[in-house]
Amino acid sequence: MRTIDKRIAPNVRLAATLVARAPALTLAYDARCKSRLAATLDTGEDVALVLPRGTVLRDGDVLVADDGALVRVAAAHEAVLLVRAPDALTLTRAAYHLGNRHTPVEVGAGCLKLEYDPALADMLTRLGATVERASAPFQPEAGAYGGGHRHGHDATFAEDYALAQQVFDEHHGHSHSHSHSHSHDHDHQHGPSCSHGHHHGHR
């Protein structure tokens, strides 16, 4: 069995014909978040995926097997919710509540897409949004500062915040004095109906 252990950086340009000839590895979003995976190429060949921990594959990524052969990643069709709203305010409110629950979301023109979840569908309907179940590829937003790893919401927030701070320091230097104190109280109850209470005090 061949092992796929490398991902070519997105900024590396490859000949289109070379990529087109590569066999596809079609995976749903949840599988694309796993760095260790037994998978099957579209050709029927079984392969082992062994990538650096924290890797999240995206549609169009190009991987390299241990024999040097290329494999291209394709996002599989899966059960999703398409969320639309009669006005921008309602759609923004829907996006806010999804973000508050740390739900992966793909943002489109006038539409939000997320993994199928009947509880979220009910919540969004109560907010005034129109929710449609569909089968489509799902490719949610990566972290705003490059953090796209799916470690759980606390790790993702910490990762993005650290990267944001790094970018700020690079642009503004390290000689600024900051007189901000932050108190964060998080009340997280994990389970089927995960509720999140966030209290942020800034002064």
Swiss-Prot record:
One of its GO terms (biological process) is protein-containing complex assembly. Keywords: Chaperone, Cytoplasm, Nickel, Nickel insertion. Residues 170-203 are annotated as: Disordered. Disulfide bonds: none annotated. It holds the Pfam family UreE_N. One of its GO terms (molecular function) is unfolded protein binding. It is found in: Cytoplasm. GO terms for cellular component: cytoplasm. Involved in urease metallocenter assembly. Binds nickel. Probably functions as a nickel donor during metallocenter assembly. Belongs to the UreE family. This is Urease accessory protein UreE. The gene is ureE.
